[in-house]
Amino acid sequence: MRFAFGAGGTGGHIVPAIALARELKSRGHECIFIGNASSMEERLAQKHSLSFFPIKVQKLYRSLNPDNLLFPYYLAGSILKSRRILKDEHIDGVITTGGFVSGPVAIAAISHKVPCFLHESNSYPGLTTRYLSRYLHRTYISFEQSRPYLPKAKLKNFGIPILESVRDTGFSLTTLGLKDDRPTILISGGSQGSLAINSVVSSVVGELLSSGWQILWQTGSLTYKQFYKQHNGKEGLYIFDFNSELSNMMKKVNLAITRAGAMTIAELEAAALPAILIPLPTAAENHQYYNALAQKNKGVAELLVQSELNPQNLLATIKKVEPDKLRKALLALPANTATEQIVTDILSFY
């Protein structure tokens, strides 16, 4: 059978799609990817040998933005083009995993009477998911907190699909000039980075290093040069904007300080890595806060809201956190078999 994926915008939406596509391909099925041209989804699809078909999708901004005037035009065009792709490529099923690309692809599938499946990573489903889920064959959720917002008869909770590389690695910190036997913190605000997190970390990095921590600090691309110039060369510190081994680093550190995107949380769980979660306050419908709150309530992470983020509070939270206790709770979680379970369930419809 042939499946089409629609996802885009961020790695948190795209990586689950890649994981599901790889699993489907391993079972003998063919997969294509639909998304914006010259985008992260195009780069990742090509990296994993998935045929890519571009459409023009524009994000609908929640604030007053003149670009919103063009949204209906681009939406109609992207739906029509997606329908043509589904027809020309003889697609048997469509799988969407979020991001503004997923809406037009899902609508095209529904209108073309192609079975459609959606995976929602976040604990609070977005408007598109809440609207489309009633028309889908199945909606897969990752948090039990999502259930009240979606049609219960079509729901399955299998968790978040992750790539195999997160689960098993022989990676060593010595390749970064650090030691494998020292307590290590991973700090990341995402691929672009977080100025709020980076600025506070910049103020406390010296104290953390002097207290015995090693630090892996992903500044992100936007402020990398600024913080690299300030801190590069300090013993026990590896500072970088992007590293393809990031998911493997998680297996070698004792504590993470990160945002609370759903994909990040899934990778933290897969690596059994305790974390201090700092939700992005501008995330749609504040979903990162609810993601982080769910993790805190499970006893596997600490929550520090950005409005309370300052050098004193960050240091106090690091000192307060009990990594061994959190790791024990993480290890007690069921193994992540979301990818396999979702694919098996999808194939049961055929």
Residue ranges and their predicted role:
Residues 324-336:
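A short, well-ordered alpha-helix in the C-terminal region of glycosyltransferases
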Residues 39-43, 93-112:
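An aromatic- and histidine-rich active-site surface loop
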Residues 2, 30, 51, 110-171:
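Active-site-proximal region of nucleotide-activated glycan assembly enzymes
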Residues 13-24:
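Short amphipathic alpha-helix
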Residues 3-8, 27-74, 158, 305-307:
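Conserved nucleotide-sugar phosphate-binding/catalytic loop shared by glycosyltransferases and other
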Residues 44, 48, 171, 178-256, ...:
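Donor-nucleotide binding loops and adjacent catalytic segments primarily
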Residues 64-93:
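An amphipathic, basic-hydrophobic alpha-helix
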Residues 91-93, 251-266, 273-274:
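Acidic donor-binding loop of glycosyltransferase active sites
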